[in-house]
UniProtKB/Swiss-Prot annotation:
Metabolic or biological pathway: Metabolic intermediate biosynthesis; chorismate biosynthesis; chorismate from D-erythrose 4-phosphate and phosphoenolpyruvate: step 5/7
Enzyme type, top EC level: transferase
Cofactors that this protein relies on: Mg(2+)
Residues reported to bind substrate: 36, 60, 82, 139
Source organism per UniProt: Shewanella frigidimarina (strain NCIMB 400)
Ligand binding (Mg(2+)): 18
Transmembrane segments: none
EC numbers, comma separated: 2.7.1.71
Binding site for ATP: 14-19, 120, 156
Role summary: Catalyzes the specific phosphorylation of the 3-hydroxyl group of shikimic acid using ATP as a cosubstrate.
InterPro entries, alphabetized: P-loop_NTPase, Shikimate/glucono_kinase, Shikimate_kinase/TSH1, Shikimate_kinase_CS
Protein name: Shikimate kinase
Amino acid sequence: MAEKRNIFLVGPMGAGKSTIGRHLAQMLHLDFHDSDHEIEQRTGADIAWVFDVEGEEGFRRREAQVIGDLSERQGIVLATGGGSVQSKDIRNYLSARGIVVYLETTIDKQVARTQRDKRRPLLQVDDPREVLESLAEIRNPLYEEIADVIVKTDEQSAKIVANQIIEQLGF
């Protein structure tokens, strides 16, 4: 696996993709990118605005373009959006262009980590837990389908999880 130089982090909201990704990139001396941040940079607006104006379909179109572009680079760690795996094109990009690491977490941890975050449009509802459970049913099999490595993120610091990923990848 070590011949694939890019590392792509997939997993649900609140799994720690961005935080762990930054640690991982620093430890491996790779460039770090976050697909949501890149979308915001390219549009000049936050994700919530893109959802409001263009809907989820418009956001997903932008996400596929951004991940397609970023995954063509070499030597990066990319934190993807939680729903990106719902796109077959994105799953194909990630599988073909790097090592895919699924950061797995429980619904309880997701709720705890995202409850005060107003930047997550899909969770601005009365019962975010119900939304997270519904998304998990759809997305978890897709994360598993493309994962080269699965790492649980519930009980450990981001730095420890990054070290576990490095060990599992043999870097």
